[in-house]
């Protein structure tokens, strides 16, 4: 009666009660119902009804086919189990005593009856599958001539060094020669006007003095130290003039030092900075004190600005070479392209000449590529020191471009990304307003250079000489006359750190590092002036030419 399992039925008992549910089991003795619902509203999971109590049965729903098949499988399994439990097992009637009297089974003798060699030989003869089509053939490593170690030119960009680096100078010279006739005509007009308006004797006239007081001092220093060649008759007169200029310089330094001491911001009162490695307190200097050090070095020790310039370039180049990877990367056998350094310079005998000398030491060995962009055209350079350093720089392999667009187009043809930008437009002896003057062309050019520099992101580091562009070297505050400024990540200090760095840290969030570079000022120079004696007892550059500062 298993075929009725799962049927929904309504059972009427002899006492008149009605019960609904699904048949879970049906036998001759009665029914077992699931999901039972009584006539009075009661419910139960299971309920058994004896056959003697049944009066009537009504089928409400029929069981599903899947339920029937499942029930049939269960019934078949039950039948098979019952058969296995029957009397049909052949070994259960064996006599155990007879089995014990039999000999032990000889595995070795029966194994010898099977000739494995002939069987496997026959299987191999009948096997027509190629070895490479088998599974083991697919997993086997292909035999090929392969070296254990890679060469230095493998797994790199092919011909990475073969780009348009050597073509930059030729394109630049063509554009320079094309603009030379027009520029010469403009220079002639400017010279004619200047000859009428400017006279060397008017050096003390306030009308012809530079805008800033720092440029006044620079102007006096060059007038005193860079005098033209003279004969014996006028030698005494020139010496007297030189003494007068130096006397005026001393008075100006004293007056400006007093004014700076009373006008410095509150955050600028700290006059020392700590070394990152030695934790030594290093005194900080004002721009006037740095100029005074150079003047004393030239006057008392006969070390001119060219010698100081060369010392700075050598020590700063060693520091930047370490930043670019050092000896592990800077090798001629390296198949990767050389790192690229971009210099933004001005026609300044300090910042511009320093940057060019530094670029020369970086590129003269062929390990580093250096491109320079001036705030003016190359044929408009006027400072003799900058012109001299430019010629040497070009002979040593440095490149010069005349515009930001030329710089960008040159970078697109090179396999070397820009890794370091050297900001040398301003320096500590002038401002961007002084560089631009009244020329809107130069001002626009400087702004485009600053904009390009600030767009360099990622691993590109921007190192400014002494002070970033757009900040005042005396106070470290943003220049109120020139709103654009460079977001430098590091500062290269010449000789001594400027006291303006204290305010610069708060006004320049991108600033991360600062390094002090030895320019070769003798220790005895600090004892010549009372204001410089605080620099005399510092052991900075004993074995190295650079020293990291803790900002």
From Swiss-Prot:
Gene3D superfamilies in alphabetical order: 2.30.30.100, YjeF N-terminal domain
Recorded superkingdom: Eukaryota
Keyword Transit peptide: no
GO molecular function: mRNA binding
Domain named YjeF N-terminal: residues: 288-527
Keyword Disulfide bond: no
SMART domains linked to this entry: FDF (SM01199)
GO cellular component: cytoplasm; nucleus; P-body
Compartments it resides in: Cytoplasm, P-body
Domain DFDF residue range list: 93-129
Keywords, alphabetical: Cytoplasm, Phosphoprotein
Residues recorded with modification Phosphoserine: 257, 261
Positions of the Sm domain: 1-63
Annotated spans, Disordered: 64-92
Principal location class: cytoplasm
UniProt record, GO biological process: cellular response to glucose starvation; deadenylation-independent decapping of nuclear-transcribed mRNA; P-body assembly; positive regulation of nuclear-transcribed mRNA catabolic process, deadenylation-dependent decay
Subunit note: Homodimer. Interacts with DCP2.
Summary of the function given for this chain in its UniProt record: Stimulates decapping of both stable and unstable mRNA during mRNA decay. Does not affect nonsense-mediated mRNA decay. Required for normal P-body assembly.
Record's miscellaneous remark: Present with 2340 molecules/cell in log phase SD medium.
Family under the similarity heading: Belongs to the EDC3 family.
Protein name: Enhancer of mRNA-decapping protein 3
Organism encoding this protein: Saccharomyces cerevisiae (strain ATCC 204508 / S288c)
Gene it is expressed from: EDC3
